[in-house]
């Protein structure tokens, strides 16, 4: 298959991110050290093993890889640019480069993973795809891929999130998806995942669960990471071409962790590169109203794997909170937990107030409206830049665009008046 005029020979293809195992693979049971594994009902074990077998087959199937490369280049718009942000850099006091995943088709990094999983579902003969979504970006990407491939699509979304991300709900429905508003629990992302798992148990014969983040039971953490690694592979080549060296730090926001693991992974073996993830601190970690899993959580089993989560002394999940729907999740992917202990990755946190402030900062310095999730990473960059110094190079993963968050931001900043004069 002809790959496309858009493909740049100096940058890696998406297939390069999945065809060969990395030096940091889970064991046969899906464990990264003590983290990961499969903590699921017996009824799901067979279908999860079916997904594992199919993925291991297709990741070395040249026809699958060529099709993925073709769609990523011609349909999704890869490679995404790496943009040096001059006015943001001036304010930060360091050289800031933005990896523009917001420019992908559907407006975020989510399409990288979804195209891979939807192709896998099609090759497995599944006619129906289900997915969970928080901010709606994964839901939109899944609905998009299903429309492209002619698959039935059902999206589970917490009722709180359907209200604060109404624009993305409309997009999903326009694309032909059925959106199920989940009324249980906190009515956010974790509850949407629970409902999706229940659906999968009931309809496993004809249904594929397109998991949106690098969490859940094996093989999802590794598979989602593989489809997202193209972010970091491109960024690594781009920064060396533009700046002549590797960055001093690579930053990303962290909820479940797919955008972060995607950009971090190709830099893991570079000792001079700091990998820093910024969690959503909500109203402040000390208040208990936050989604900072590492800062305020502890290890435990949650939604299919063993990792860090927000839980009480009895092991019951604590409700998370963030103005960002995509970061409003009380767990994190197991590979992040492992990397936190084994590699030079660190975690910081950003409150709602600072995340929203840096949302506006990026709008007014660079003319880029980011997702509120991504604004947490921008806030992190302005936080660490003084420590690193003016000569430092910082790569920030701008994981998504902020169309979906304009109403939230307008309410936060009081921008809804009829006139400025």
UniProtKB/Swiss-Prot annotation:
Its cofactor is pyridoxal 5'-phosphate. The modification N6-(pyridoxal phosphate)lysine is found at residue 110. The keyword Lyase applies. Its EC number is 4.2.1.20. The beta subunit is responsible for the synthesis of L-tryptophan from indole and L-serine. Belongs to the TrpB family. This is Tryptophan synthase beta chain. The gene is trpB.
């Amino acid at each position: 298959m002809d790959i496309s005029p858009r493909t740049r020979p100096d940058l890696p293809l998406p297939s390069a991110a999945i065809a060969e195992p990395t030096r940091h693979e889970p064991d046969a049971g899906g464990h990264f050290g003590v983290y990961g594994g499969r903590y699921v009902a017996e009824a799901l074990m067979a279908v999860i093993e079916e997904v594992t077998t199919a993925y291991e087959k297709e990741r070395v199937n040249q026809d699958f890889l060529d099709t993925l490369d073709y769609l990523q280049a011609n349909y999704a718009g890869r490679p995404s640019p790496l943009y040096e942000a001059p006015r943001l850099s001036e304010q930060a006091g360091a050289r800031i480069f933005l990896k523009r995943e917001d420019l992908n088709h559907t407006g975020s990094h989510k399409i990288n993973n979804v195209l891979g999983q939807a192709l896998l579902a099609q090759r497995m003969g599944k006619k129906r795809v289900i997915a969970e979504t928080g901010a709606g970006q994964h839901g939109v990407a899944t609905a998009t891929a299903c429309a492209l491939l002619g698959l039935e699509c059902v999206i589970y979304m917490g009722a709180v999130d359907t209200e604060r991300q109404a624009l993305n709900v409309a997009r999903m429905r326009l694309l032909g998806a059925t959106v199920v508003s989940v009324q249980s629990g906190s009515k956010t992302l974790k509850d949407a995942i629970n409902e999706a798992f229940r659906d999968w148990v009931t309809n496993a014969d004809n249904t594929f669960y397109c998991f949106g983040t690098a969490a859940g039971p094996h093989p999802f953490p590794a598979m989602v990471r593989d489809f997202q690694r193209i972010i970091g592979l491109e960024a690594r080549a781009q920064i060396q071409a533009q700046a002549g060296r590797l960055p001093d730090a690579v930053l990303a926001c962290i909820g479940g962790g797919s955008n972060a693991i995607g950009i971090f992974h190709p830099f893991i073996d570079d000792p001079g590169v700091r990998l820093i993830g910024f969690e959503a601190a909500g109203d402040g970690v000390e208040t208990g109203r936050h989604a900072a899993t590492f800062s305020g959580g502890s290890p435990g089993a949650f939604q299919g794997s063993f990792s860090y989560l927000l839980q009480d002394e009895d092991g019951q999940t604590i409700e998370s909170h963030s103005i960002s729907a995509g970061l409003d999740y009380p767990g994190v992917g197991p590979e992040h937990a492992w990397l936190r202990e084994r590699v030079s990755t660190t975690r910081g946190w950003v409150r709602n107030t600072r995340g929203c402030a840096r949302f506006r900062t990026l709008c007014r310095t660079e003319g880029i409206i980011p997702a509120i999730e991504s604004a947490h990473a921008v806030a992190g960059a302005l936080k660490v830049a003084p420590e690193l110094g003016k000569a430092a190079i910082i790569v920030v993963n701008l994981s998504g665009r902020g169309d979906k968050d304009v109403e939230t931001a307008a309410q936060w900043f009081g921008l809804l008046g009829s006139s400025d004069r």
